[in-house]
């Protein structure tokens, strides 16, 4: 039986030797069950005679563009290299594309570097083919099965290379890298494939007879398989009495039609294993035997008679049955299984049941505990055993002529599992969803033995993880959008990293510090030759020396080209989700900003008090002119092109409506931050950002109502604490009435404040 040929991901678009990014990195890694077909031609298209694109597969996940460049640049000038990665996790998909400037270098790399070890794994190189129709064609594709486990890609390639030009060669492997016993060889022509089948089919490879034939697509195999199932002739019989002989077994089924073979399965000692097979000459005879003999009792045992199935077919059927049963259990107990955590160590199953029994009928209640594997022999027994051994040694020294006494038999140490310390959480399953909902409402945050309980509906670990990842991703997206909107910049587009060779666009010559081996991205600033990595190429606005910083100590912008002062909140927290910008922060003493960093731009559209100059420095560009003494505050009109933001004190709906939406959040954040900082100094920035997701009218109400603000701060703090505590924890699935330990969360739980 063969497997379907999987398709090779599309290569980069190549224009004048420079690849354009495609969506190949966004695809998930396909399951490797077959050879990845290459182009049926050995050279790239005629429209690009001076370029050659190679597909490099079987790569270790840790392989980078730089490693591949070091290897492939030894052949010739490399135009570009890209390792394809998952769009979300950015993990390597195990393959890459290498583009040369000319076809000759690509041919030489294919010949010299194929199956070269990279990070201990032999890479597989072939021409990339962007046309999916050519990649999926089965012409010239040969399937080989019954391969010895020692045969790898290179050995298979060497065996079949004598019959024609091989485009791709692969031995299928499992997730552990072990051979599955079959492989594929894709020839350039159908004649070469026929020649290989003719000469190798039935031969011995490593003392194993191999089958070689044309590859059949999965679609064709499936239709053929369905036809075979509908016209089966082989019958499987089990629950056969061990006293039944082969002759009796055959006579049991002879009345249904001509039998080509009938056999009972026996062990090494010749005893019947209780099952056997009967193959009829026609499908009608086999169907009649199944209809009449199934569930028939013979010699006190009820027979099972049905169509004989292959192992993989039975496994797939069992897997489907298990999945259906699992989904049925999950739906049955949906909404009735509760997860309870923050339990004290003295709470056991009975006490947990007592706590929740007033809310309805409980089908099961369980506190999860550590399991300790130990032996039955106690420590005291071990000490007694050591003492007796010492006495025997002394007696042996004193009476050497006497034979030592036979030692008593040691007690057998049988391992057993005992329940240990409570993990601090458990599960309670009710008989109805209404009872469970009532228990959640009443028991969540209730103090039990000095600790507030956390009670919620139990979720499967994978469901909870996916929900958490989705919420984090959505929150990060909102932060990026708000940061870009606050800076007045378009949304950043992060292009996949591409490694360029010397002479290509975006390449920084070797030996120059501060360069980056990637194409310049939108919003990125390249380092200047001879400068520090990330140094801004040119003086920063308003940076003319001064006390706070030397004239050459430029502050580099971040990856979006926004000055760092406009993107940071208190304590260096990135101002990505409306965190208040520290316009009022002064480094040093005095309202005039004696110790303020010269040239550090304030947040866009923000002017803090004492917006002046550092001692001995030039005036900050776009700021007020000095009015005399050092560090004195001065008032001046805003610079051209910059909007003036009204003061944050006494905010009203009319005031907010007069400014753009991004600045509305900014003003609200600056007004909220001091109030929140008074309550939670360490997490003021995070809590402010969380509250800024609320509606502006609600935020205005919080500014006027201290009690409401304190309640919202406590609520945000509890949400943040739950997020931090649940990072490494998992909740058990509601698959059965009795919660399972294998889906439990970790043991350690902190007390809630």
UniProtKB/Swiss-Prot annotation:
- PROSITE patterns tied to this protein: PABC, RRM
GO MF annotation: an example: poly(U) RNA binding
Reply yes or no: does the keyword Lyase apply.
Answer: no
The segment annotated Disordered runs over: 1-52, 367-417, 602-645, 728-753
Where in the sequence does UniProt note compositional bias of the Low complexity kind?
A: 37-52
Which positions fall inside the RRM domain? 52-130, 140-217, 233-310, 336-460
Q: What is this protein called?
A: Polyadenylate-binding protein, cytoplasmic and nuclear
**Gene Ontology biological process:** mRNA processing; mRNA transport; regulation of translation
Q: In what ranges is there compositional bias, type Gly residues?
A: 605-631
Example of a GO cellular component annotation carried by this entry: nucleus
Keywords assigned by UniProt?
Cytoplasm, mRNA processing, mRNA transport, Nucleus, Repeat, RNA-binding, Translation regulation, Transport
Native species:
Aspergillus fumigatus (strain ATCC MYA-4609 / CBS 101355 / FGSC A1100 / Af293)
Does Nucleus show up as a keyword for this record?
yes
What's the encoding gene here? Answer: pab1
Task: Name all PABC domain ranges.
Answer: 648-725
**Which PANTHER family is this protein grouped with?**
RNA BINDING PROTEIN
Where, per UniProt, does this protein localize?
Cytoplasm; Nucleus
**SUPFAM superfamilies registered for this protein in UniProt:** PABC (PABP) domain, RNA-binding domain, RBD
Biased segments, Polar residues type: 1-26
Q: What does this protein do?
A: Binds the poly(A) tail of mRNA. Appears to be an important mediator of the multiple roles of the poly(A) tail in mRNA biogenesis, stability and translation. In the nucleus, involved in both mRNA cleavage and polyadenylation. Is also required for efficient mRNA export to the cytoplasm. Acts in concert with a poly(A)-specific nuclease (PAN) to affect poly(A) tail shortening, which may occur concomitantly with either nucleocytoplasmic mRNA transport or translational initiation.
Q: Which InterPro entries match?
A: Nucleotide-bd_a/b_plait_sf, PABP-dom, PABP_1234, PABP_HYD_C, PABP_RRM1, RBD_domain_sf, RRM2_I_PABPs, RRM_dom
From start to end residue, where is composition biased (Basic and acidic residues)?
A: 379-417, 737-753
Q: What family does this belong to?
A: Belongs to the polyadenylate-binding protein type-1 family.
């Amino acid at each position: 039986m063969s497997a379907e040929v999987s398709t090779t991901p599309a290569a980069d678009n190549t224009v004048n030797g420079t690849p354009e990014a495609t969506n190949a990195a966004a695809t998930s890694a396909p399951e490797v069950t077959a050879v990845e077909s290459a182009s049926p031609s050995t050279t790239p298209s005629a429209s690009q005679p001076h370029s050659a694109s190679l597909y490099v597969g079987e790569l270790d996940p840790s392989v980078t563009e730089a490693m591949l460049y070091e290897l492939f640049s030894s052949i010739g000038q490399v135009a570009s290299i890209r390792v394809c990665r998952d769009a979300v996790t950015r993990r390597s998909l195990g393959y890459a594309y290498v583009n040369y400037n000319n076809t000759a270098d690509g041919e030489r790399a294919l010949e010299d570097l194929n199956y070269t070890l990279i990070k201990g794994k032999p890479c597989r190189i072939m021409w990339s083919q962007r046309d999916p129709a050519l990649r999926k064609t089965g012409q010239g594709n040969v399937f080989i099965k019954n391969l010895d486990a020692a045969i790898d890609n290179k050995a298979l390639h060497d065996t079949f290379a004598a019959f024609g030009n091989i485009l791709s060669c692969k031995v299928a492997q499992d997730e552990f890298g072990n051979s599955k016993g079959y492989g594929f060889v894709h020839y350039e022509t159908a004649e070469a494939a026929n020649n290989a089948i003719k000469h190798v089919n039935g031969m011995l490879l490593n003392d194993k007879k191999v089958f070689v034939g044309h590859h059949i697509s999965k679609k064709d195999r499936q239709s053929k398989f369905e036809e075979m199932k509908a016209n089966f002739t082989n019958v499987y019989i089990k629950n056969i009495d061990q006293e039944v002989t082969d002759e009796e077994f055959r006579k049991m089924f002879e009345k249904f039609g001509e039998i080509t073979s009938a056999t009972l399965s026996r062990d090494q000692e010749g005893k019947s294993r209780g099952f056997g097979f009967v193959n009829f000459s026609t499908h009608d005879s086999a169907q009649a035997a199944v209809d009449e003999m199934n569930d028939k009792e013979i010699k006190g045992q009820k027979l099972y008679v049905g169509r004989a199935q292959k192992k993989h077919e039975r496994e797939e059927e069992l897997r489907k049955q298990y999945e259906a049963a699992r989904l049925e259990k999950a739906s049955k107990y949906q909404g009735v299984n509760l997860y309870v955590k923050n339990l004290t160590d003295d709470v056991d199953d009975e006490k947990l049941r007592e706590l929740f029994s007033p809310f309805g009928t409980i089908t099961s209640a369980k506190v999860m505990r550590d399991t300790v594997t130990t032996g039955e022999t106690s420590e005291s027994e071990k000490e007694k055993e050591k003492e007796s051994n010492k006495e025997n040694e002394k007696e042996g020294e004193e009476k050497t002529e006497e034979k030592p006494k036979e030692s008593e038999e040691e007690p057998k140490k049988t391992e057993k599992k005992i329940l240990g310390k409570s993990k601090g959480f458990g599960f309670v399953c009710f008989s109805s969803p209404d009872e469970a909902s009532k228990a959640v409402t009443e028991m969540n945050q209730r103090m039990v033995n000095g600790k507030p309980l956390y009670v919620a509906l139990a979720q499967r670990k994978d469901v909870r993880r996916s929900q958490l990842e989705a919420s984090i991703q959505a929150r990060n997206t909102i932060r990026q959008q708000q940061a870009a909107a606050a800076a007045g910049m378009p949304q950043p587009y992060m292009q996949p990293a591409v490694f360029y060779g010397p002479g290509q666009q975006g390449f920084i010559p070797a030996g120059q510090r501060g360069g980056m081996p990637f194409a310049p991205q939108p919003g990125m600033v390249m380092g200047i030759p001879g400068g520090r990595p990330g140094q801004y190429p040119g003086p920063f606005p308003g940076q003319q020396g001064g006390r706070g910083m030397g004239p050459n100590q430029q502050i580099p912008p971040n990856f979006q080209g926004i000055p760092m002062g406009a993107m940071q909140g208190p304590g260096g927290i990135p101002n990505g989700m409306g965190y208040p910008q520290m316009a009022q922060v002064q480094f040093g003493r005095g309202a005039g900003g004696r110790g303020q960093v010269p040239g550090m731009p304030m947040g866009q559209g923000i002017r803090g008090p004492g917006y002046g100059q550092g001692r001995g420095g030039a005036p900050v560009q776009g700021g007020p002119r000095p009015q005399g003494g050092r560090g004195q505050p001065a008032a001046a009109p805003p610079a051209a092109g910059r909007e003036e933001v009204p003061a944050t004190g006494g905010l009203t709906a009319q005031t907010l409506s007069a400014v753009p939406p991004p600045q509305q959040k900014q003003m609200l954040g600056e007004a909220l931050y001091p109030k929140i900082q008074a309550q939670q100094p360490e997490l003021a920035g995070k809590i402010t950002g969380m509250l800024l997701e609320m509606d502006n009218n609600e935020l205005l109400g919080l500014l006027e109502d201290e009690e409401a603000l304190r309640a919202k701060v406590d609520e945000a703090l509890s949400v943040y604490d739950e997020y931090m505590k649940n990072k490494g924890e998992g909740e058990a699935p509601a698959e059965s009435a009795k919660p399972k330990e294998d889906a439990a969360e970790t043991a350690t739980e902190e007390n809630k404040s």
